[in-house]
């Protein structure tokens, strides 16, 4: 029987295969208990076009100091920031890769904030 983490990794592999076949840039999200990370990766998967995380100093100052990167408000800030960086890199449309995480809580907050900031997926 697969563990919960192995099941999540299997789901993420399948998603990445489907996205790679589309050939569109992907917005990849990873979360830990303390931080949330987002990156926009090129359609062929060779280059990171934009990235943002709560581990960045500017973001930590914006969200209110250290140790506050694992909440919904921080995820919203990262969603807005990744959308701005992606648009600056010339990317308007992406495929959302939630890496097997449930579309709920911090992952959903990041996605909604990125959509509101103008990223299409």
UniProtKB/Swiss-Prot annotation:
InterPro entries to which the protein is assigned, alphabetical: Ribosomal_uL18_bac-type (IPR004389), Ribosomal_uL18_bac/euk (IPR005484)
SUPFAM superfamilies: Translational machinery components
A GO cellular component annotation in the UniProt record: cytosolic large ribosomal subunit
Example GO BP: translation
CDD domains: Ribosomal_L18_L5e
Molecular function per GO: 5S rRNA binding; structural constituent of ribosome
Keywords of this entry: Ribonucleoprotein, Ribosomal protein, RNA-binding, rRNA-binding
Function: This is one of the proteins that bind and probably mediate the attachment of the 5S RNA into the large ribosomal subunit, where it forms part of the central protuberance.
Oligomeric and partner information: Part of the 50S ribosomal subunit; part of the 5S rRNA/L5/L18/L25 subcomplex. Contacts the 5S and 23S rRNAs.
Family: Belongs to the universal ribosomal protein uL18 family.
Protein's UniProt name: Large ribosomal subunit protein uL18
